[in-house]
Amino acid sequence: VANPPFSLDKWGADTAVADQHNRFHRGVPPKSKGDYAFISHMIETTYEDVGKVGVIVPHGVLFRSSSEGQIRKKLIDENLLEAVIGLPANLFFGTGIPAAILIFNRGKEANKDILFIDGSREFESGKNQNKLRDKDIEHIVSAFKAFKAATPLTSEKGAVIEDKYSYRATIADIIENDYNLNIPRYVDTFEEEAEVDIKATQATIVDLNKQLSAVGIQMENY
């Protein structure tokens, strides 16, 4: 479990090419963004078949292309990614950007589904920093436990677990989205605007204008 520096510049890409531990066999991350360097190191140092990784990352890790996109694709194709959990903005010291938790599991076996959670709207606002409440954490944990306990999907299309909060994606979903893990592609949080009753609104405006005229007449008598 780790919270490495977000998009660290000059992380050591020049020496990673000849890494004696072969940690970057999926590709070398860009010199200016070390996010996947930390992820690669963590995964390669866990036990085969049982190792698990939880890492906090900026959202760019979910969708940036080029070498990062290739690394992300290989991690997914190897069935290592288990969950993508979106967090609220302004949660960490030193940055106000929203972050996500990536869960990797080297023991997923035949289950290729990936859980997406949008927890970005559940938090307690603070003067300088937001915080996750106990109930917000429990919501995330319970969604993850339910995902783990459920039977893997047999269809190519994923399924909504909780409306506007969590989604169980299949590998077909991921491929359809070109391995882009941006959470809104999977969790639909769109809120429809309430339908406006035009006639009722017009009647209210007429009534308010009448009241305004009556007040104006009263004021003229003073």
Language model regions located:
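A conserved structural/catalytic subdomain of Rossmann-like adenosyl-cofactor enzymes
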Residues: 1-222
